[in-house]
Amino acid sequence: MADLLEKTRKITSILKRSEEQMQEDLPYNAITRQLADIIHCNACIINSKGRLLGYFMRYKTNNDRVEAFFQDKNFPEEYVQEANLVYETEANLPVTHDLTIFPVETKDDFPDGLTTIAPIHVSGIRLGSLIIWRNDKEFADDDLILVEIASTVVGIQLLNFQREEDEKNIRRRTAVTMAVNTLSYSELRAVSAILGELNGNEGQLTASVIADRIGITRSVIVNALRKLESAGIIESRSLGMKGTYLKVLIPDVFDEIKKRDY
């Protein structure tokens, strides 16, 4: 019991992860490594769309094709759809099962391979799946307890992070709307023309050329850019005779300007 408690504490420490760690490319490499070390298995976490959030390969069980999924950080759509239909932990699935993590061409190499899938959901929201696998030995009850605890911990962390991201998006959209509302008719035309000059979210432009083309003064463009920059929506840098370098920091401004029909 003491051993199980200590293992549980190691897993729940994931709740102390910072927001910065959550924004890493693979934010759950740490917990998959902990699980793999504690349970002696391979482990990975995917979200409900199949994006890889973290993995750790303790044992070589897959071929180049499957390892490409880990490199690309995406799982096959068919597999993800099947995994999303798992509502309770499915333990010790054989290599003949549709949800086995072992690729079909390696079944002869790992005939006793076993896969366990634990759904990650909080408050009825499906957030992803925690998948662990071994070459031969079955996962015991203690292993499954730890897996379910881990899936719950990851679910809570993912939900909190998702809510924080939603709040950030709302604040960003509000900032864009408020900034655009301060623009005059001429400034709106200027911003629309400027955004149309960019290559994606950034680019180089010449204010005087744009001003002449749409029939406004250069000062209108300068004022419009200053308002957006002070709101944190764009950043700009003078390139001297070459014009101005502009980068959009909050892409929502494209849709907001488009809604104004400029």
From Swiss-Prot:
Keyword Nucleotidyltransferase tagged: no
Record's Gene Ontology CC terms? cytoplasm
Biological process terms from the Gene Ontology for this record are: negative regulation of DNA-templated transcription
**Source domain of life:** Bacteria
> Quick check: keyword Transcription in the entry?
yes
Q: Where is this region: GAF domain?
A: 1-159
Q: Which family does it belong to?
A: Belongs to the CodY family.
**What role is this protein assigned?**
DNA-binding global transcriptional regulator which is involved in the adaptive response to starvation and acts by directly or indirectly controlling the expression of numerous genes in response to nutrient availability. During rapid exponential growth, CodY is highly active and represses genes whose products allow adaptation to nutrient depletion.
The protein's name in its UniProt record: Global transcriptional regulator CodY
Lineage, please?
A: Bacteria, Bacillati, Bacillota, Bacilli, Lactobacillales
* Gene that encodes the chain: codY
